[in-house]
Amino acid sequence: MQPRETLVIDIAKLKTHGMMGYSGAVKNLFGVVPGLLKPELHSRYPEKEPFAEMLVDLCEYVHPDFSIIDAIDAMEGDGPTGGQKRFVGALVGSESPYEADMVGAKLIDMNPEEILVLKNAQERGLCAGKLSEIEVLGDDFENIVVYDFKRARSSSIDFTTRVPKFMQPLAKRILTPYPKINTAQCVGCGKCAESCPQHTITVREHKTHIEYSKCIHCFCCHEMCPKHVINIKRFSLFDL
């Protein structure tokens, strides 16, 4: 580690994430982006792969000296704000945010290859290609892996790439998870509309409405809703 005038320590909470599936050391650095610029970046990179590439670019720019993932009490389900607390009982620390995330992902029984930021970093040669290539000190984390950790509903396998190209727009419209407002509990505060990068959300008569034809499925509304009344819905077959 080269000496620097400023020491950057990245402290993240291990969570599931509605858009990216997993949130740890790398995704946490999106927090350095000023508030109003976040929706702009979501709008500029509406698809998961380009967004993941942007997160890796950001990580390389910030270049944290040390990354810590708090996985003592993690969040499962529809994170990063609408999930439930789940005890894992671990702290992960590394000079590499990517390798910290590889271990963090394993703790909740996620394959690092499923996580797009790690896949992108591995393709660039920024971290180990496999978890077995990382020297892990301390407790044997294999003994504390939570195998029934609930994932975000939107992070299901993307089947749209498995159909013929001409059918993908229709398949995406049918199969892609989407935000659904519980209008009975919505208080019309407008926080979701403020956070929406595509300006698809309006508040009328103290109730929120989404214009789904313009929705890019970034789930910023789900993340920012202070009342947690915006849920992530998906094709019902995934729940069978």
PLM region spans:
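Flavin-dependent oxidoreductase catalytic cores
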Residues: Q185-G188
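Extended, low-polarity segments enriched in aliphatic/aromatic residues
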Residues: M1-N182, S236-L240
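Extended, alpha-helix-rich binding/interface surfaces that flank or overlap catalytic cores
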Residues: I216-H217
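Iron-sulfur cluster-binding cysteine motifs and their immediate structural context
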Residues: I181, K191-H209, C220-S236
